[in-house]
Amino acid sequence: MLKKSCRLCNQKLFEKPLLTLHGMPKAAQHFLNKDELFNDESIDLDIFQCMSCGLVQLNIEPVSYFKEVITAASISGDAKKSRLNQMLEFSTKYNLKNKKIIEIGCAKGNMLDIIEEAQMNAYGLEYSSDSVSIAKKEGRRVIKGFIGDIEEIKYGPYHGFVCFNYLEHVPDPKSVINKIYNNLYSNGIGLITVPNLEYLLNTKCFYEFVADHLSYFTIETLKNAFSSNKFDVLECNLINNENDILIIVKKNPQKKI
């Protein structure tokens, strides 16, 4: 069923799409087998904007595997160094050394090793049974589940959370943000990254509009996603040559919405 209201604030979408992309793949993950390839058809992606909060989004149903984080490779080389520096700064600046941090959508848990190296106690939440099994064999503390389905995350509450390019995949980002909020201590800190919509538009990277990505954030709409759900925004910057947005937020139980 096509959505007519915003995924974030539940207000109306503009009636006409901002953009329609023709001949797009039904999904961005999983290779098709021979039979599936024969029967596969492209789709049109209609990209809408909320009349109220401005969030740009698809109005389609999520792909079947949206609860899972699918990554092709481990983190190594320059990427690992960059992530470690990021986590060291996060740990030091926000007094998170030896505190419990959970990664929402952690795949096989490779990032958890880096969080541990930054002297935080790393936990992960992942829906894929295969990924959880691999993570546990590596000695990582990974919990099986999807944040949108869980009221209380095992071993919680947590002092902080991280979420790397996952929020754009979920069909109900408001619910996910609220579930995270409810599993943090009163002053819990979060670090989140998402793709930068303005970069996609400025560089005409229309192939980055995929059925897997349901929400397309700008700095302002990402700030609003958290500030409208009882978080204070502490930082918000462009990273990775402006490909992504990084936001740091703090739970504020006193905040009135």
Language-model segments: what does each one mean?
Residues 1-79, 237, 248:
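N-terminal juxtadomain amphipathic helix
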Residues 8-15, 219-236:
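A SAM-dependent methyltransferase catalytic signature shared across enzymes that methylate proteins
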Residues 23-29, 192-215, 219-221:
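Short, glycine-/aromatic-enriched active-site segment of Class I SAM-dependent methyltransferases
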Residues 40-134, 145:
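Extended interfacial segments that mediate partner engagement and assembly in macromolecular machines
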Residues 139-150:
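Conserved SAM-binding strand-loop segment of SAM-dependent methyltransferases
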Residues 162:
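A conserved beta-strand element that flanks and buttresses the S-adenosyl-L-methionine
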Residues 174-189:
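A short glycine-rich, Lys/Arg-flanked "PGG" loop and its adjoining helix->strand segment in the class I
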Residues 234, 242-257:
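Flexible, glycine-/basic-rich loop-and-beta segments that form/coincide
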